Swiss-Prot record:
Gene3D superfamilies per record: Aldehyde Dehydrogenase, Chain A, domain 1, Aldehyde Dehydrogenase, Chain A, domain 2
Pfam family for this entry, one: Aldedh
Function per UniProt: May be involved in V.cholerae virulence, as its expression is under the control of ToxR, a transcriptional activator of several genes associated with virulence.
Pathway membership, UniProt: Alcohol metabolism; ethanol degradation; acetate from ethanol: step 2/2
Source organism: Vibrio cholerae serotype O1 (strain ATCC 39315 / El Tor Inaba N16961)
Catalytic site: 262, 301
Protein's name in the database: Aldehyde dehydrogenase
GO biological process: ethanol catabolic process
Family: Belongs to the aldehyde dehydrogenase family.
EC assignment: 1.2.1.3
GO molecular function, one term: aldehyde dehydrogenase (NAD+) activity
SUPFAM superfamilies: ALDH-like
Enzyme class: oxidoreductase
Amino acid sequence: MIYPIPNSETSTVHFKDVYDNYIGGQWMKPHSGEYFSNTSPVNGLVFCRVARSSSQDVELALDAAHNALESWSTTSAVERSNILLRIADRIESNLETLAIVESWDNGKPIRETLAADLPLTIDHFRYFAACIRSQEGAASELDSRTLTYHLPEPIGVVGQIIPWNFPLLMAAWKLAPALAAGCTVVLKPAEQTPVSILFLMEIIGDLIPAGVINVVNGFGSEAGNALATSQRIDKLAFTGSTEIGNHILKCAADNLIPSTIELGGKSPNIYFPDIFSHEDQYLDKCIEGALLAFFNQGEVCTCPSRILVHESIYEKFIAKIIERVALIKQGNPLDTETQIGAQVSKEQYDKILGYIQIGKDEGAELIFGGHPNNQENYLSGGYYIKPTLFFGHNQMHIFQEEIFGPVIAITKFKDEIEALHLANDTVYGLGAGVWTRDINIAHRMAKNIKAGRVWVNCYHAYPAHAAFGGYKKSGIGRETHKLTLSHYQNIKNVLISHEIHPLGLF
């Protein structure tokens, strides 16, 4: 099935010409009156204009968030939970529409937005609705005369900066726990994909008290920086590049603002020789696991962009990979048969092609792809790159630096010790994959890989109840899982003495 182009007569999606900020439950024009053009990576054409916000707009959003905080933070956990459930239901009833919006704004295949992005977005709201209903403070008797208990309380007004690779899902990762905890939010979407969250607010805005969620659009260096440097936020959450994350942390540190940051990765996908002990469905799953590096066009922070394969199976492994890659269907993101869509922007497209050239220049062997995959007709202006495979060594730039595109760098290892060394030989520590039939190898590797998430015999699973976050330069803090609530709460300890006699010290 091929969905009609948005704004066409037969499409269910019609974008407005201009999108404003969403502040205090209302759509507000930017203070400067300026807007920026928003381009679809599907065809390279501008399809709307979006508010280019400044610090004045951020201040208005913070005013609204502060005004709403007292009421929202004292709303019962039951009512907050019910609102999150209603949000999930509303998204679910508009799933197909939002999937089209997300694909057009980002360039990803609609089969992914229909089957992954939107269902996971819905599930995260439902999960945190359940978490806040079941959260309990700890209480204990210290001695026969002293009782203590702990109260989780909303941390306050939260600034959230969202990346462009999963606009709605990454918003849900941050919004759901923050709202559940009783916080109010000022959210800044990525300027590359600003419309998805605005479309969402048109759908769910009536379910949320005014000022609880505020969306301010614009460039990171303007609106994003104003939010990150504000002294009026009580918490900052950011997902994006390590370079920008470093700047964000410095801004927050100047104001002693607690921060959660999820940054880059260069994740290894490790294949042990026993995967070839049988020609079965498991082996087929292993090969598919390697190609998951092309999921979302490789624009995933945990992208398994480094494949480490045992030298004894290298030739057989590569033959199967090439055979499978050649069958990948790339093209129209609105076609449900499409497996790889367009890169998010011209800037990202050029960056990826630049890294492909670096790989060639530094002597890596180009095994497959390595060039644009130009489309025809109305897709001709889009940003499409052929899935690319390189063979090289772990010190090359294409092994050490995050490309964020459909590029896999492959190398060999001789034993488990070398595999572990190669896996950990990176400044990043976000994710890793281990593929083996041997449970002992699986446990040893999972324990010793320095990464926040290790997938064993699977990859790219992101359930709401599994904690996500990085080691090393891949981030600080965790998202998803109930422990995320603690990032949006202060813990108050109450210590009560029922001893009537004084201490006798003074």
